[in-house]
Amino acid sequence: MPIDAWVREEVEIPEGVEVTIERNVVKVRGPKGELERELKYPGVQIFTEDGKVVIYKEFPRKKDIAIARTFKAHIANMIKGVTEGFTYKLKVVYSHFPMTVKVQGDEVVIENFLGEKNPRRAKILPGVTVKVMGSEVIVEGIDKEAVGQTAANIEQATRITKWDRRVFQDGIYIVEKAGKPIKF
């Protein structure tokens, strides 16, 4: 049962950003690069109008409204990515065994984690750069999902199972997501 006559969500296009929409594929080009994403859902229309991206659906149900707002958030994140970019900061924590973290190609290699002989590896997604500076790992890129997934891959690579995590707190932990500090 429709809730309203229509749902209309708008996203402002800032100066220096170009948005093109062809067959449900939204392309955003800005000073830091270009992103492309397919946003498709039955009955939901996406178009540009007066310097704005408009997401529109007639006679929406609850799910249609949720989809329209999700598309709005995706487009806003794409615009923010090509203008400012996204940065995640991770902290390397160890007590007894000094671990070394380095970038090799499209992987982050963690050596001597809890004294292990075999290095642990975390995948770096395309379009993401990882820098290791002492005990800090910085993950940067224009695609929010790729940057977040790369940071999560690094954090998951040092996950400890079957040991008491209150005692063995070694690992690499996300301390700042997209400029916002994490509360523990």
From Swiss-Prot:
Q: Which domain of life is it from?
A: Archaea
Asked whether the UniProt record includes RNA-binding among its keywords, one would answer yes
Annotated GO MF terms: rRNA binding; structural constituent of ribosome
Q: Which UniProt keywords apply?
A: Ribonucleoprotein, Ribosomal protein, RNA-binding, rRNA-binding
Q: Which SUPFAM superfamilies match?
A: Ribosomal protein L6
GO cellular component term of the entry, any: cytosolic large ribosomal subunit
Q: Which GO terms describe its biological process?
A: cytoplasmic translation
Does this entry carry the keyword Mitochondrion? no
Its quaternary organisation is:
Part of the 50S ribosomal subunit.
Q: Which family does it belong to?
A: Belongs to the universal ribosomal protein uL6 family.
Name the job this protein performs: This protein binds to the 23S rRNA, and is important in its secondary structure. It is located near the subunit interface in the base of the L7/L12 stalk, and near the tRNA binding site of the peptidyltransferase center.
Q: What is this protein called?
A: Large ribosomal subunit protein uL6
